[in-house]
Amino acid sequence: MVILDETACQNTPNTSRVLYESGSKNVIAKIPDRIKINMIGFQSINCKSYVEATKKSNAYTFLISLCNFRILNSENEECCKLINEAINHPNLSEKNIKKEISKNLSSEYDLINKINDKLYDDNSKEKSINSIRRICNKEDPNNKAKIERRKRININKNLENPKIKELTNKEKRINLVLDNARIHTAKMIEKAVEILNINLISLRPYCPDLSPIEDVWRVIKKTTYKTKYNSANELINLFKDKYYEIIESKSFYENWLDQNDINF
C-alpha cells in the first residue's frame, strides 16, 4: 500500500504572517528571489518510500515518477534496466523529437499553397489571418504542444515492450492511493499502470485531508520555512532529507489505516 501526492514548496508563503515573542520580533532571513519547487511523494506502508522534484505537473512527468517508483520497488535487475531505458530513450529528447516532426512537415511549396488558399478563400480578413496562423503553428517544429504530444506517444511506445510487462507481472503488485487530479486519470497513465503492475485507488473527490501524506508535507514545510537556503537545489535537498527522515514514522498513517479498516 502506497499513498501518493504532489505538493509545491517555496521560500515565500502564500499568506503573510508576523511572529512575535514577548517584547521582540522574530526575523527570518530569506533571500530576495522567489524560489519554488514541485515535489511528488510516495508514502509507502509495506515497500520503499520515494520522493522527487518535478519541473512540471502533467501526465508525462507523472508517468516518469511512476516508472522511477516501480524501478525502486522491483527486484529483477533486467526489469529495472528495461524501464530505465524506456524513460531515458533518445526518442524522448526535444532535439530528436523536432527532427522527427520535421520529417512530416509540408514542403515549402506546399506550405505556400496552403497559405494562399486560405488567403483568398475566406471573405473575412480576420478569418484568413487566424487560418494562416493555425497553419504556421501546425507546420512549426518548435510547437510546444506538438513536442509534448509526441513525447507522450513515444514514451508509451517505449513502455509497450512485451518483456517489460512480463517482468513487472512477476513483481509485487503496488496499490497506489491518490486523488482524482486530471493527470492521474489520463489515458496514457491508465495504459502505463497496467504495464507497470500498479493498481490506482482513488480517494473521494475534494477530500485531500483523507490522505495521510498531507501531514508529512506540513511537517516538512515547517522545517523549510525556518531554514535558510540560497537556491532551488538546496531547497530540494532540504525537502528530500526531511522527507526520508520522517516518512517511515507509522504515526502518520496508523489512524488512517484504522479508519479504513486496513490491516497489514
Positions of predicted regions on the chain:
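DNA-recognition alpha helix
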Residues: I97, Y109-N123
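RNase H-like two-metal-ion nuclease catalytic core shared by retroviral integrases
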Residues: L178-N180, I201-T223
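Generic structural signal for small/hydrophobic residues in well-ordered secondary structure
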Residues: D5-T7, G41-Q43, L66, I115, ...
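Acidic/histidine-rich, metal-coordinating catalytic segments
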Residues: D5, K81-N88, K95, T168-H184, ...
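Short, amphipathic alpha-helical "recognition" segments used to contact nucleic acids or chromatin
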Residues: A86, N91-Y109
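C-terminal anion-handling pockets and recognition modules
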Residues: I213-F264
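Extended, low-complexity cationic-aromatic segments
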Residues: M1-L72, N76-C80, N84, H89
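Major-groove recognition helix of helix-turn-helix-like DNA-binding domains
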Residues: K125-D140
